[in-house]
C-alpha cells in the first residue's frame, strides 16, 4: 500500500460523493497528446488531418475488407499507451525477429490523429483495426451502426493513470460551483466526458445539469483549452498533461479531479472489424499475445516509438519514461476483468454522456462489442492474478480525522429504510438495489477512500443513539465489502444526532435518519 501525504496546500485534493441513504419512517491525451474527435468528413487516405466544424453531405458505408488477407491494418494516434504495439512490431511494419514476427503475424500501423479519418477508413475497409478509448468507441457507435459496420473490442492496452483531469480556479471545489462558470473542454474529447460524467452523477436538478452541459465552451484541442485556462479566460478546464501539473504549481489553481483516482473512466483498446476478427481469430489472439509480451518493454525500450511517432522525435529516454507514468499497462488478468464487467458498465455511462451532449449512440453494441473469445485461448499462458502497479491508499488515523471536514465535490442522495432502532435494512433487496448504483460509482472511482457516516433522529444525545448510528454505517460498509470493495478503502463514523438537517419532531425528521457515504480522493 502506498502512503499518501495529506496537506491542505493544494497538493491534496479531496473528492467526495455523498450518498445519503435515508432511513424512512421505520428508521463519478484521456491523455494529453490525443486530438479531439472531429466532426465527420471524408477520409484523406490515411494521413493526419485537422478538425472541421462542417459535416459532409455523404457518409461512408461499410465496405468489404479482404478477409482472406490475415494482415492487420491498424491505425493509432500519438499516445504513449500504444507503445507495446509499436514495440511488438518494432516499427510501423512488422520487422524480422520482432515479437509479432515470432508469433507469425504481420501488422501495418498507420499514425492517424484524426478519429474521423480513422473511423471512415475502418468503415470503408481500408483499415481492419483502430485504437480508441471506450469513451470514443461509444461516441463512434452510432456512426458505425448507421454505416452497417459491426466491430469488436477484444483487448485493452492501458488505463489513463493521471494524464487526464479537471482543473479549476481556487474556490471552485464542487459540481454545484460549476453553475454559471466558464468551463472549457476539448470538443468531443475524452476530457469532455469527465465533466459530463460528474454532472450526470450529481444531485443537481435536470435544469442545472443541462445548463452546465449547454454552456461548456468548446475548443479544438486540449492544448488550446489548457492555454485558455492559464490565460485567465476560463474558470474550469477539462484537459490533460502537462496542464494538470501546471495547476499544482499555480497558487490560484488546483486539480479538482484526475484519472489517478479512476482507472476505468478512460481506457484504451483496439477495435477490430468483426468480419476480419471472425475470419482470423488466431491472428487476433496472437496480436493480443504480442501486446502482453511487449508490456515488459514499456519502460525500458524507447527507440521504436521515437522513430514512428513525431511527438517523441528528439525526446530523451528519461522524458519518454516519465510520460509512461500517465498510462498503466493492462495484461491478461486486467483484460479478463474489464471485458467481462468494467468495460460494458463504462460504455453505458459514456452512452449516457454522449446522448446528454446531443449525439446518437448504439447502446446495444455493448452486447457483442467486448468479446473475450480472442483472449481466453491465452488463459494457460498468463496468470489470472492482476499485475497492476496501483496500490490502495494507506491512511493513518490522524489523516483519517483530517479529511472528515473537506468540502464535497459531488453530492448524490438515495433513500433506503432501516428497521426502527436497529441497523437492519427494512427491505434488504430494495436497499441492495439502491446501493448497487453507488457500488458501480465506487468501482469506477477505484482510487478513493470511502467514508461512511451513520446518523439518527433524536432530540437529545445518548450513548445508545451514538452506537446505533455507528452500526448503521457499518451495515452499509459491509454491503460494499460484500460487493468486492476493498475494506482498506472504508472508514466508518457514527455521528449520532450531531448532523441533523431537520427538526426531530417535524415531517422532515426522516431526513435525519440517514447514512452519508463520501468518496474522498487524495492526490499526491
Question: What are these model-predicted stretches?
Answer:
Residues 24-41:
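Hydrophobic single-pass membrane-insertion segments
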Residues 278-362:
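Secondary-structure end/capping motifs
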Residues 428-429, 455-524:
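Periplasmic OmpA-like peptidoglycan-binding domain that tethers envelope proteins to the cell wall
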Amino acid at each position: 500500500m502506498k502512503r499518501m501525504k495529506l496537506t491542505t496546500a493544494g497538493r491534496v485534493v479531496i473528492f467526495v460523493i455523498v450518498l445519503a441513504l435515508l432511513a424512512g419512517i421505520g428508521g463519478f491525451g484521456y491523455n494529453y497528446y490525443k486530438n479531439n474527435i472531429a466532426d465527420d468528413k471524408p477520409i484523406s487516405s490515411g494521413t493526419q488531418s485537422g478538425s472541421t466544424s462542417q459535416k459532409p453531405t455523404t457518409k461512408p458505408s461499410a465496405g468489404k475488407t479482404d478477409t482472406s488477407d490475415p494482415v492487420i491494418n491498424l491505425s493509432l494516434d500519438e499516445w504513449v499507451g500504444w507503445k507495446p504495439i509499436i514495440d511488438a512490431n518494432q516499427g510501423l511494419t512488422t520487422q524480422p525477429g520482432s515479437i509479432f514476427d515470432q508469433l507469425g503475424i504481420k501488422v501495418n500501423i498507420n499514425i492517424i490523429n484524426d478519429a474521423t479519418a480513422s473511423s471512415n477508413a475502418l468503415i470503408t475497409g481500408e483499415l481492419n483495426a483502430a485504437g480508441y478509448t471506450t469513451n470514443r468507441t461509444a461516441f463512434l457507435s452510432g456512426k458505425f451502426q448507421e454505416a452497417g459496420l459491426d466491430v469488436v473490442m477484444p483487448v485493452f492496452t492501458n488505463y489513463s493513470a493521471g494524464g487526464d483531469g479537471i482543473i479549476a480556479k481556487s474556490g471552485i471545489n464542487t459540481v454545484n460551483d460549476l453553475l454559471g462558470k466558464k468551463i472549457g473542454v476539448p470538443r468531443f474529447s475524452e476530457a469532455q466526458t469527465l465533466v459530463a460524467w460528474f454532472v450526470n452523477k450529481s444531485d443537481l436538478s435536470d435544469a442545472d445539469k443541462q445548463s452546465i452541459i449547454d454552456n461548456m465552451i468548446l475548443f479544438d484541442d486540449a492544448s488550446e483549452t489548457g492555454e485558455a485556462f492559464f490565460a485567465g479566460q476560463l474558470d474550469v478546464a477539462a484537459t490533460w498533461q502537462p496542464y494538470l501539473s501546471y495547476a499544482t504549481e499555480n497558487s490560484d489553481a488546483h486539480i479538482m479531479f484526475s484519472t489517478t483516482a479512476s482507472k476505468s473512466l478512460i481506457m484504451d483498446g483496439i477495435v477490430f472489424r468483426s468480419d476480419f476478427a471472425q475470419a482470423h481469430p488466431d491472428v487476433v489472439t496472437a496480436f493480443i499475445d504480442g501486446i502482453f509480451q511487449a508490456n515488459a518493454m514499456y519502460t525500458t525500450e524507447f527507440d521504436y516509438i521515437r522513430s514512428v511517432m513525431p511527438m517523441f522525435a528528439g525526446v530523451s529516454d528519461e522524458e519518454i519514461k516519465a510520460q509512461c507514468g500517465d498510462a498503466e499497462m493492462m495484461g491478461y488478468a486486467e483484460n479478463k476483468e474489464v471485458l467481462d464487467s468494467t468495460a460494458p458498465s463504462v460504455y453505458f455511462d459514456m452512452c449516457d454522456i454522449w446522448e446528454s451532449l446531443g449525439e446518437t449512440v448504439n447502446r446495444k453494441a455493448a452486447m457483442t462489442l467486448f468479446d473475450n473469445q480472442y483472449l481466453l485461448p491465452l488463459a494457460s499462458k498468463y496468470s489470472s492474478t492482476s499485475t497492476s502497479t496501483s496500490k490502495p491508499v494507506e491512511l493513518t488515523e490522524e489523516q483519517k480525522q483530517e479529511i472528515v471536514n473537506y468540502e464535497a465535490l459531488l453530492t448524490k442522495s438515495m433513500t433506503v429504510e432501516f428497521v426502527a432502532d436497529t441497523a437492519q435494512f427494512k427491505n434488504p433487496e430494495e436497499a441492495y438495489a439502491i446501493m448497487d448504483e453507488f457500488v458501480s460509482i465506487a468501482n469506477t472511482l477505484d482510487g478513493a477512500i470511502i467514508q461512511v457516516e451513520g446518523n439518527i433522529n433524536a432530540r437529545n444525545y445518548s450513548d445508545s443513539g451514538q452506537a446505533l448510528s455507528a452500526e448503521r454505517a457499518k451495515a452499509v460498509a459491509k454491503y460494499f465489502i460484500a460487493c468486492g470493495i476493498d475494506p482498506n478503502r472504508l472508514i466508518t463514523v457514527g455521528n449520532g444526532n450531531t448532523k441533523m438537517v431537520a427538526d426531530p419532531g417535524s415531517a422532515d425528521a426522516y431526513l435525519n435518519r440517514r447514512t452519508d457515504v463520501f468518496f474522498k480522493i487524495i492526490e499526491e
